[in-house]
Amino acid sequence: MADLRAQDDARRGVLSLTREEMEAVALEGRQVAGPLGRETALRVLREGELVVVGRLLSASNATFFGLVEERGSDGRPGIVASCVYKPIRGERPLRDFPDGTLACREVAAHAVSEASGWDLIPPTVMRDGPFGEGMAQLWMEVDESVDMMVVVGDDSPALRRMAVMDAVLNNADRKGGHLLPLSDGRILGVDNGLCFAVEPKLRTVLWQWRGLPLDDQEVAVVAHLGELMETSLGEQLGELLTPAEVAATTRRIDGLLRHRRFPLPDPNRPAVPWPPF
């Protein structure tokens, strides 16, 4: 971590710029691609050249804003996309999660989101980068007109799906600031590193459906996840998590199907992350 901070000090001039200004400096006249399809985004994130532009100083772990550029077979510039890059070397030790595992958990959370068909987490991959292996996630432009401090308590289908997903993921850190409202009405969840603990740790600001029945579509999606845990999804998670964490995910899915209700807060531990935003 010390070497990351030392190298980061050299970028202080860049870090004082806005995200748009950082992007303009790095692009040197090139254009960031518009909205990308899922497969294209994942390919560019995995295979494109990753350039760190600046550090996002509000994050607790080393988190960088970067650009990934896919080059053609002739070496010419291709698609350029903005991303968030979180190197494993920059993860702060935590008391209740193993060291160096947060990036894998973020990628695993995206895998579950993809399997659900709900598209709740931006495209996310594991890859090498300037500071070593880590997580790269497609940068999402938010709708600045939406105040999540107001919206987070709404009874909206988008937030309700997120609450179901977080119950499957055992998300211990669903803050309001980890929800990104997009201009097309979707709400995506980011900063999903504190997921998949074996013991119950659900901490979220989305408790408005606590104890209520899951609807038929939610039950169907959770059941589909359960089926995929026996095949492709289970294999994906097995490459990113421990066997105990994969088994615990299956148990959470089974529990949701058995009770067919949103979970209740545990009175013996904090139910809301701090700070909540």
Q: Positions of the model-derived regions?
A:
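C-terminal catalytic region of ATP-dependent kinase domains
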Residues: 3-10, 98, 182-277
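Short loop/turn hinge sites at secondary-structure boundaries
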Residues: 38-43, 47-54, 170, 258-270
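Short low-complexity stretches enriched in small and charged residues
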Residues: 21, 31-36, 91-95, 142-147, ...
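Conserved ATP-binding subdomain of kinase catalytic cores across diverse folds
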Residues: 43-154, 159-172, 176-177, 182-192, ...
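Short, flexible coil/linker elements and helix-boundary hinge sites characteristic
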Residues: 13, 29, 173, 260-261
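Juxta-kinase regulatory segment immediately upstream of eukaryotic protein kinase catalytic domains
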Residues: 2-45
